[in-house]
From Swiss-Prot:
Name of the protein: Histidinol dehydrogenase
Gene this protein is translated from: hisD
Binding site for Zn(2+): 260, 263, 361, 420
Parts of the chain that traverse the membrane: none
Main EC class the enzyme belongs to: oxidoreductase
SUPFAM superfamilies the UniProt entry points to: ALDH-like
Gene Ontology molecular functions: histidinol dehydrogenase activity; NAD binding; zinc ion binding
A GO CC annotation given for this chain: cytosol
Signal peptide location: none
Complexes and interactors: Homodimer.
Isomerase listed as a keyword: no
Cofactor: Zn(2+)
UniProt organism field: Buchnera aphidicola subsp. Acyrthosiphon pisum (strain APS)
Active site: 327 (proton acceptor), 328 (proton acceptor)
Length: 435
């Protein structure tokens, strides 16, 4: 059966049509969601745990009296998982730890002038919240992606929230990462609890993690409150762009496109290639592989937003890719690193035949929390720096201040900031014995 046959010739399209092809599925503003989330946040602020209990029963159909998961339940989660799964989680943990430890920044300590010492130091965030969605497929891999850099950074308090009942996979992943403050609360109410605090759930300084439209809206709203909780990013639907030439494997490409298409209705996958024969083989392979996949309805909805695009050459592939700024970029060409040199916008890049996007999702070591919706033009993938803050330190000796004093006084006078000038002058006068 032919589920997909959307091959497009880029240079036969009008510029407006080209723009439309690269447009993401529209994320419609939903006033009902905005209003509902605002009400949930306000009720959590006013009524704390009572509001959490009410919403947990309403949305999750769970009657929860104790939100915090006991340490016994967390540690016993190991007994419910197979050795094969636990060993695989350990491999992923090792690789993610290795890559993120390599991101530990070095302190900067320089003397810009004689007697003028400037430093940049890195301090961990005091408290962070991790949100892990529930559902039929618990995202325990995201626990690793968030908890491991938080621990390496030295965050003092790490709180995890997830809708009840929390899966043993999520509890186990949290346990091996050293997270023991876990609360069975989900949705917008969990984000509100982390941002505001309740009798049980502690308030945190920054919230990390994906979620549905309600969770995303809640993150947006709590981060907009004056002096409110910070957030990692507003994650959008998953997206993948592949650049391929005639050396690529069409079955591999089809499998990669489908791996992202199964994320859901608003996801988008695109293949760019100068090779029509390859494009035809990819389309055939997509239709063949679809017969063996379980999430067929989700994939078919995604494929309606997706395209196989024929272009003139690899240079045009690169130009279009940089314009699109994908979340995930796979380069399957004869010389992928040569193409990499010309890529300016992408969140996570996968080179060559043997680098499926799934590797980055789970176990290569890189983080899978990534900017979407073209945000890779200015934003970066999640990393150690998101769990830290840069602090600047300066120390001047008397000699150093004397040397800079004239410069500072002239500059502050030019900006008509007399008090700034005086803060230097009063010290200089003291050193000259005028006070």
């Amino acid at each position: 059966m032919k589920y997909f046959k959307n091959i497009i010739f880029w240079n036969k399209l009008h510029p407006d049509e080209q723009k439309k092809i690269l447009s993401r599925p529209i994320l419609k503003e939903n006033n009902f969601i905005k209003k509902t989330v605002k009400e949930i946040i306000e009720n959590v602020r006013l009524f704390g745990n009572s509001a959490l209990k009410k919403y947990t029963f309403l949305f999750d159909k769970q009657d929860i009296n104790t939100f915090q998961v006991s340490k016994e339940k967390i540690s016993s989660s190991s007994f419910y998982l197979s050795k094969v799964l636990k060993d695989s989680i350990s491999v992923a943990q090792k690789n993610i730890t290795c890559f993120h430890k390599a991101q530990i920044p070095s302190k900067i300590d320089v003397e810009t002038e004689v007697g003028v010492r400037c430093e940049q130091i890195y301090l961990p965030l005091n408290s962070i919240g991790i949100y892990i969605p529930g559902g039929t497929a618990p995202l325990f891999s995201t626990v690793l992606m968030l908890a491991i850099p938080a621990k390496i950074s030295g965050c003092k308090k790490i709180i995890l929230c997830s809708p009840p009942p929390i899966s043993n996979e999520v509890l186990y992943a949290a346990h091996i990462c050293g997270i023991h403050d876990i609360y069975q609360v989900g949705g917008a109410q969990a984000i509100a609890a982390l941002a505001l605090g309740t009798e049980t759930v502690p308030k945190v300084d920054k919230i990390f993690g994906p979620g549905n439209a309600y969770v995303t809206e809640a993150k947006l709203q709590v981060s907009s409150i004056f002096n409110g909780t910070e957030i990692d990013m507003l994650a959008g639907p998953s997206e993948l762009l592949i650049i391929a030439d005639n050396t690529a494997n069409p079955d591999f490409i089809a499998a990669d496109l489908l791996s992202q298409a199964e994320h859901g209705v608003s996801s988008q996958v695109i293949l760019l290639t100068p090779c029509f024969e390859l494009a035809e083989k990819v389309v055939l392979s997509i239709n063949k592989q679809l017969n063996n996949l379980s999430r067929l309805s989700e994939i078919l909805k995604t494929l309606k937003n997706s395209s196989v695009i024929i272009v003139k050459n690899l240079s045009e592939c690169i130009e279009i890719s940089n314009m699109y700024a994908p979340e995930h970029l796979i380069i399957q060409t004869q010389s992928p690193r040569e193409v990499l040199n010309y890529i300016s916008n992408a969140s996570s890049i996968f080179l060559g035949l043997w680098s499926p996007e799934s590797a980055g999702d789970y176990a290569s070591g890189t983080n899978h929390v990534l900017p979407t919706y073209g945000k890779s033009i200015t934003n970066s993938s999640l990393g150690l720096c998101d769990f830290q803050k840069r602090v600047l330190v300066q120390e001047l000796t008397a000699k150093g201040l004397m040397k800079l004093s004239n410069t500072i006084e002239i500059l502050s006078s030019a900006e008509k900031l007399q008090a700034h000038k005086n803060a230097v002058k009063i010290r200089v006068d003291f050193l000259k014995g005028k006070i």
